[in-house]
Regions:
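Histidine-centered, transition-metal-coordinating active-site segments
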Residues: 1-87, 101, 105-404
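Short active-site segment of divalent metal-dependent hydrolases/proteases
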Residues: 94, 98-99
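Alpha-helical scaffold segments that flank or form the walls of functional sites
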Residues: 90-91
Length: 404
């Protein structure tokens, strides 16, 4: 294989190369190539037109950063064998292969588990070495390798914050990725940060919180997600009673399988085989087809999404009471009464209630630890002057009522 096959031009990091041929062959596999057809930020491009980047570019970028992180740890004298190095690269490359179309928005439409569980099943289908799976699932003896793949300060987050900031144009996501990785060290097989890196970690935590509210939980994006879920809910309801009519309104048979049979368990091999053939294009093709459907509710919802008429979001700091919800439902029903939609249909497909919440830092997960020259280890909540325990523990909650 020529070297040119191992070089990729990334818009964030420039020309990047990978040291193992096995990595190249994994990239060429259908499971990784599928990620080209799944956008990293789902429907966020309805708000940020530049957010067209994919899970594929993120996975490659994360793998590149992993080579930098592992090389840095090796230069500091930490023992990472070639087999461990290669296995860790494979784990980060494949970490998102279990994502559904439109990523987190539709995660539980297909399977009753998280995408990480599907990623692990795909690793097994690819006959990955046991070290790859052990590192991914946190059962490998050197725990810092898993922490680089998945933790509160992992390579995944370092890449997606940088990449999402670049493509959305939201500068709050810019972090000192290079600086943070240079501060990585290992203590008792755990990933730690040299004390000089504390300010970069503070910036990282604050940037992630800001990106959540400005991008990931932007109210228009959440509203678009609600609309897409309503479309698929209506399609499922029609499929169950044999009224989706795929003969006259053809859609992907793999998508129809899930609409007809509902959410599946991850041990369903047939469902997994159909799932890995699905991507964003299957959903968009269905939405375009349904915009002409004879079912008025389905066609109205589908056409609304196609034309970016995603409805209104009403956000408040406390939960909606039953009385408030009823009042909004009645008002919405009056709006559509002339179109013949029933009150029950309005509640089921045209109105969605939910909660948006975000915490800058979780004390339930492994902590970000700072390593001082005197050998002392402190959690970031103890070491930081800016991020005390009260700030880090505070969970911001917003409750919404979305109407089409």
């Amino acid at each position: 294989m020529g070297n040119k096959l191992k070089i990729i031009n990334d818009p964030i990091y420039g020309f990047i190369s990978f040291p193992f041929e096995s990595i190249y062959y994994l990239i060429q596999s259908p499971y990784v190539q599928r990620l080209r057809r799944i956008k990293q930020l789902g429907l966020s491009n309805l708000v940020y037109p530049g957010a067209e980047h994919t899970r594929f570019s993120h996975s490659l970028g994360a793998m590149y950063l992993m080579t930098k992180a592992l090389d840095g740890l090796r230069q500091k004298g930490y023992d990472i064998t070639e087999k461990e190095y290669e296995a860790t690269l494979k784990a980060i490359l494949l970490h998102d292969t279990g994502h559904s179309p439109f990523s987190h928005c539709l995660e539980h439409l297909f399977f009753s588990c998280h995408h990480e569980d599907i990623s692990k099943l795909i690793m097994k289908k690819l006959n990955c070495e046991k070290e790859v799976i052990e590192i991914f699932e946190n059962s490998y003896k050197k725990r810092f390798l898993h922490q680089l793949v998945s933790s509160q300060l992992d390579i995944d987050r370092l890449d997606y914050l940088t990449r999402d900031s670049f493509f959305t144009g939201v500068s709050e996501g810019v972090i000192g990725t290079e600086r943070i990785m240079n501060m990585f060290s290992v203590y008792n097989d755990e990933l730690v940060i040299d004390e000089k890196g504390i300010y970069s970690i503070e910036k990282f935590i604050i940037s992630r919180r800001l990106m959540y509210w400005q991008v990931y939980m932007h109210k228009t994006v959440v509203g678009a997600d609600c609309l897409l879920k309503s479309i698929l809910q209506r399609a499922k309801d029609l499929a169950i009673i044999n009224k989706l009519d795929i003969k006259n309104y053809p859609i992907s048979l793999n998508l129809f399988y899930f609409l007809e049979n509902g959410t599946q368990e991850p041990n369903n091999i047939e469902a997994l085989d159909k799932f890995i053939l699905l991507d964003d294009t299957d959903i968009w093709n269905a939405v375009k087809t349904w915009s002409l459907h004879s079912d008025k509710i389905l066609s109205y919802l589908a056409l609304s999404l196609m034309n970016r008429s995603v409805g209104k979001m009403y956000v408040k700091n406390s939960e909606y009471t039953g009385e408030e919800l009823q009042e909004r439902h009645v008002s919405l029903f009056e709006k559509y009464k002339t179109q013949g939609f029933s009150f029950d249909a309005i509640k089921r497909y045209f109105a969605t209630t939910g909660k948006m919440h975000n915490r800058a830092y979780s004390f339930n997960d492994e902590q970000i630890n700072i390593w001082y020259k005197n050998g002392e280890i402190k959690g970031i909540h103890e070491a930081s002057d800016q991020l005390d325990e009260i700030f880090l523990q505070k969970e911001i909650k917003k409750f919404y009522y979305h109407e089409i």
